[in-house]
């Protein structure tokens, strides 16, 4: 699977450099998520004759929210990405109806300049046409190490748990700006 991530460009040099610092931790995490029966992860691998052509995974990131991540496919195998997404759709369609699935929301982070996820997820949101059923929000992201981030904050900045009042303010602000589902999914 690691070779597949490199072959598809899912793990690109800058991402690998960032991950390499914690290589042993990443390896243990992947062994646990892919090798053990866990209630917080699911993965789908499309392969033929032992060769991986497509992959997608889900991780339960919040109490009743699952995140689709690590979607990748080899371009030489036509429609491998669609095959994996179709299977993931079938899985979530069946699975979310079970109370034990803890699946009220599905989220996915993707860069809008990536054509495939933008067409799949963006088109779904457009076709649904209701922010209270399916929403897309633009966020920024960056790589950082938690220890570096926390240790280098200067006054008056601090990183603390949000208060009830702050969460209410976030909800009100988000509702005005987006009207989507993100805060509910948290």
What are the functions of these language-model segments?
Residues 1-9, 144-164:
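Conserved N-terminal entry element of GNAT/NAT acetyltransferase domains
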Residues 2-73, 171, 175-186:
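A conserved beta-strand-loop-helix scaffold within acyl/acetyltransferase catalytic domains
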Residues 123-155:
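Extended low-complexity acidic/polar segments
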Residues 23-27, 82-85, 167:
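Short, well-ordered alpha-helical scaffold segments within catalytic/effector domains
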Residues 77-78, 130-142, 171, 177, ...:
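Extended, low-complexity, amphipathic alpha-helical coiled-coil/linker regions that act as scaffolds
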Residues 95-96, 105-108, 157-162, 167-183:
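Compact beta-rich and alpha/beta scaffold cores in large eukaryotic transport/transcription complexes
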Residues 1-6, 116-125, 142, 174:
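Generic hydrophobic, helix-prone segments enriched in Leu/Val/Ile
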Residues 40, 48-54, 59-135:
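Acyl-donor binding region in acyl/amide transferases
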């Amino acid at each position: 699977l690691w070779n597949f991530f490199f072959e598809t460009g899912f793990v690109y040099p800058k991402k690998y450099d960032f991950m390499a610092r914690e290589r042993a931790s990443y390896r243990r995490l992947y062994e646990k998520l892919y090798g053990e029966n866990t209630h917080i992860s699911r993965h789908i691998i499309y392969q033929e004759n032992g060769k991986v052509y497509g992959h997608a995974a889900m991780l339960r990131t919040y109490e009743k929210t699952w995140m689709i991540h690590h979607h990748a496919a080899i371009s030489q195998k036509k429609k491998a990405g669609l095959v994996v997404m179709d299977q993931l759709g079938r899985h979530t369609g069946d699975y979310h109806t079970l109370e034990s699935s803890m699946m009220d929301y599905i989220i996915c982070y993707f860069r809008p300049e990536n054509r495939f996820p933008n067409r799949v997820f963006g088109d779904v949101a457009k076709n649904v046409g209701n922010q209270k059923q399916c929403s897309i929000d633009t966020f920024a992201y960056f790589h950082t190490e938690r220890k570096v981030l926390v240790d280098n904050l200067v006054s008056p900045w601090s990183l603390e748990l949000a208060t009830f009042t702050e969460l209410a303010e976030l909800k009100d602000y988000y509702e005005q700006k987006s009207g989507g589902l993100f805060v509910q999914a948290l």
